[in-house]
Amino acid sequence: MSTRSLTIFILAHVWLLMATTSIAQFVIDTSGEPVEDDEEYFIRPAITGNGGGSTLVTGNGPCPLHVGLDNTEGTLGVAVKFTPFAPQHDDDDVRLNRDLRVTFLTSTSCGQSTDWRLGEKDATSGRRLIVTGRDNGAGSQGNFFRIVQTQTGGTYNIQWCPTEACPSCKVQCGTVGVIRENGKNLLALDGDALPVVFQKE
C-alpha cells in the first residue's frame, strides 16, 4: 500500500470515528433523531410493565406534586422540555451527561414551577423522591438532572448529579427509578434504575 493510500485510509477511519463519537454525544429519540431543547417530548419506560409515561402525581398532600409514571400502561403521560444548564449557542441538541432542567409542559393548581426537583426522602423506603417546584437554594442544583446512556442502544437513564450546576458541591448522585406506593408509581433515586426512551410529541 502506498503512503498516499495509507494516509487516506487512516484519515477516513479517523473521520468515521469522530463522526460516530459526535453522534454518540447526543440523546436520540424513538424516531432516531437527536432530542432538541426547544421541542416537546414524552418520557416513557423502555420496558413494559412499569406503567405509562411520566406525569404529575399527588403525594400525601395536594402540593408539591411528585413526578411519577401514569398507572395505565402505554399512555404517553405529560410532555416535557429540556433546558440545558450550559446551552450550546450553535445547536439545540440535548447532550448526554450534561446538566439540564426537565419541565412538565402543563399548569397546576399548586401555582408553582413544574420543573423536576430532588425532594425529601420517602419515609418508608428511604429513597429520595422526585417532586416539582424550584429549588431556591444556592445554585438551584436540586433542579438539574442529566441523561445517561444505558448499555442497551436507544435507552437512557435519568440521573441527579449536578456537577456542572455546582462543581464544588459534594452530592450523593443517584439514578431515577420507580417506587410503587399506595397505588401510585413515584419516581425516586437510590434503587433500581428505570430505563427510558424519549418520544417526540
UniProtKB/Swiss-Prot annotation:
Induction statement: Accumulates in roots during colonization by arbuscular mycorrhizal (AM) fungi (e.g. Rhizophagus irregularis and Glomus intraradices).
GO biological process: arbuscular mycorrhizal association; response to symbiotic fungus
Disulfide bridges in this chain: 63-110, 161-173, 166-169
Site, Important in determining the strength and specificity of the interaction with its subsrate: residue positions: 170
UniProt keyword list: Apoplast, Disulfide bond, Protease inhibitor, Secreted, Serine protease inhibitor, Signal
Effect of residue 170 to E: Enables interaction with SCP1
Chain coiled-coil ranges: none
Pfam families for the chain: Kunitz_legume
Annotated compartments: Secreted; Secreted, Extracellular space, Apoplast
Similarity comment: Belongs to the protease inhibitor I3 (leguminous Kunitz-type inhibitor) family.
Its biological purpose: Protease inhibitor involved in the control of mycorrhiza establishment and arbuscule development during root colonization by arbuscular mycorrhizal (AM) fungi (e.g. Rhizophagus irregularis).
The name this protein goes by in its record: Kunitz type trypsin inhibitor 104
The organism of origin for this protein: Medicago truncatula (Barrel medic)
